């Protein structure tokens, strides 16, 4: 079983496309900037997994700029 599950993540960000986009951008930032992350510990060793864990924890949210 993967953690966090896609069902739990979709409760935080309602679109699969948006979820993937946010996680990918955060993972890329963590990789390029050698960012250790905002959580004290992670289950995943990979950047995308860490980004998904941050979304699940509510530390990473999608900002909607619709006008």
Swiss-Prot record:
The gene is rpoZ. GO terms for molecular function: DNA binding; DNA-directed RNA polymerase activity. This is DNA-directed RNA polymerase subunit omega. Promotes RNA polymerase assembly. Latches the N- and C-terminal regions of the beta' subunit thereby facilitating its interaction with the beta and alpha subunits. Its EC number is 2.7.7.6. Belongs to the RNA polymerase subunit omega family. It comes from the Bacteria. The RNAP catalytic core consists of 2 alpha, 1 beta, 1 beta' and 1 omega subunit. When a sigma factor is associated with the core the holoenzyme is formed, which can initiate transcription. It comes from Listeria welshimeri serovar 6b (strain ATCC 35897 / DSM 20650 / CCUG 15529 / CIP 8149 / NCTC 11857 / SLCC 5334 / V8). InterPro entries: DNA-dir_RNA_pol_omega, Pol_omega/Rpo6/RPB6, RPB6/omega-like_sf. Signal peptide: none annotated. One of its GO terms (cellular component) is DNA-directed RNA polymerase complex. Keywords: DNA-directed RNA polymerase, Nucleotidyltransferase, Transcription, Transferase. One of its GO terms (biological process) is DNA-templated transcription. It catalyses: RNA(n) + a ribonucleoside 5'-triphosphate = RNA(n+1) + diphosphate.
């Amino acid at each position: 079983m993967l953690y966090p599950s896609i069902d739990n993540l979709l409760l935080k960000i309602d679109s699969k496309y948006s979820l993937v986009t946010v996680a990918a951008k955060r993972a890329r930032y963590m990789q390029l900037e050698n960012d250790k992350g905002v959580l004290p510990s992670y289950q995943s060793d990979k950047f995308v997994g860490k980004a998904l864990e941050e979304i699940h924890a509510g530390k990473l949210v999608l900002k909607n700029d619709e006008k």
